[in-house]
Amino acid sequence: MEKPVLISDEVNYAWNFLNYPIHTITAKPKEESSKSCAILLIHGFGASTDHWRFNIPVLSDKYEVHAIDLLGFGKSPKPTDVQYSSHLWKDQVATYVKEVIKKPTFIVGNSLGGYASLAASAELKELSAGVVLLNAAGMFSEEKVSNNSLLQKSLKTFFETFLRGNVFLQRTIFESMRRRVNIKKALNNVYKNQANVDDYLIDSIRKPSLDPGAFNVFKSVFNPTGVQGEPFDKLFKKLTSPLLLLWGGKDPWMNTASKRLLYKKYAPENTKEVILDAGHCPHDEVPELVNQHILDWIDSL
């Protein structure tokens, strides 16, 4: 098992986005490196920079490594006057690369962070050295016009409309989901090996959910024009840098057979795919494998 980084409880507000202070972490090799690129780590929905505890120490042995808390998550602010969306987080990632890193960057993202990483990389062009998707969240155009029956579509539309307009029900779900016992249960469901589902991980998710404004971020998942962004197939057409797909093959959420087929159909030619014996968060469940695959892939380019 990789040795975890001792992530401080203190915040590092060294950079602002939309006039909000953003918590960031930067780690560099102890000895001066000749590497001309950097690595940026982007967490998923409800997570934070803490989720890279096993990755930052290893990757930063060779490369300059950055990790940021997306606006609305972790130690970053959770303003109530912001429209939370994939577009917002894509802009945050791209802006950080342009304003802070200022050199070609390998952007690594898990779940929602995977989508933000891909979308930002497609926009960054020459500042994108490559993209690593760890069970990324997002949709393809074909999925948005799927062949569901009329009844299925009607039930889905009714449920989404009812839930979207019912703040009381949303709040009830939110309060239930942020209980420690339920956070642990959810993590156990998406980690094939639960050895790393520890108090540190649970607290890293629960503490930010207690911040004022956290409920407004959670509500964004019910906004039909919110979290979902541009389809993957369109983003792949814009991407000019190499792509590494690191799949946790036992992910109950993202790694469906139909989804994998769509990746194979639309992913650019310069794509490598690796299937790992893990769940939705392979970087935290099997970090030694993820770290090695990332480093080997970068070295091979």
Could you tell me what each predicted segment is?
Residues G114-K125, V131:
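Short glycine-enriched nucleophile-adjacent loop
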Residues A47-P57, K75-K78, A116, S141-E142, ...:
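Short N-terminal helix/helix-N-cap motif within the alpha/beta-hydrolase-1
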Residues A122, V131-R171:
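Flexible "cap/lid" loop of the alpha/beta hydrolase fold
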Residues T26-K75:
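Conserved HGGG/HGGXW glycine-rich cap/lid loop of the alpha/beta-hydrolase fold
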Residues Q170-K237:
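Conserved alpha/beta-hydrolase catalytic His-Asp/Glu region
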Residues E269-L301:
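Catalytic active-site module of serine/aspartate enzymes centered on a nucleophile-bearing elbow/loop
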Residues V11, W15-Y20, A27-E31, H66-V108, ...:
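Active-site loop/oxyanion-hole signature of alpha/beta-hydrolase fold enzymes
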Residues K238-A278:
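Conserved loop-alpha-helix segment in the C-terminal half of the alpha/beta-hydrolase fold
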